[in-house]
């Protein structure tokens, strides 16, 4: 049996999956990432995925959101300073197309990942991003196949910054190789379908031996109107696009695994929330997101445990290794 973990994108709403996974991890004998054979994540989910694959505990990743979240989104002030900062961000967005500088995000990620490379991952990894110049997908992968000969040398920080470079929020990320990349959420905000396709098509794992845990960053629930104002339509179009992509990706995973008609293979965690209650950059709701994640884990733990957490996964040995890597 092969186990896959997939984590959606969603900005600061990543606190929800981080909290959910941390609560699940509290009863385990090893870090949660060690219980999966393949981990995929996009944007904020990509940051979580990389951390888990590198051996970090979900608890430590959650603490990163709690301690650094407000600073990353420049909401660590109040009063006149906060008001001025909000005006500055609006002006910055108009001038440069990016609401927030990336320096604080980079500093936070370097603090947990340092100089680690993709090849240092202890679990197979798949992190979607987008190459703006050629308008093509760019997926960071561990060396879990003979033909994957490049990414394992790349900095984990580069992969994290690339997948999280959400247009309008952060500027395009330029990697150490001078490659410009943006948020993988443009095409794979929910990467579960592509993770399952990787498992079946590249790793050649039997589809009927897969178990998949797919975790969202909440699902906005609201009424759909027959028409919207021009201003509202801009944000709604993005919402509709993301929802469509997510359902398409999940549908692909269902087809490949035979779930639910042939067997149970996919467990989708997608807690509903009132539309507009949790925006992608509102750090004032971190505690509420953590609350929701814990409550969801409390309900799901007895259901998920026998399928995903009876014992750690088989150790991952990459095909191509970094110098000094003695895994065999």
Q: How would you describe each model-predicted region?
A:
Residues 4-7, 37-43, 125-130, 181, ...:
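Extended hydrophobic secondary-structure segments that form protein cores and membrane-embedded regions
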Residues 171-178, 186-188, 207-210, 217-219, ...:
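C-terminal helical/tail subdomains of lipid-metabolizing enzymes
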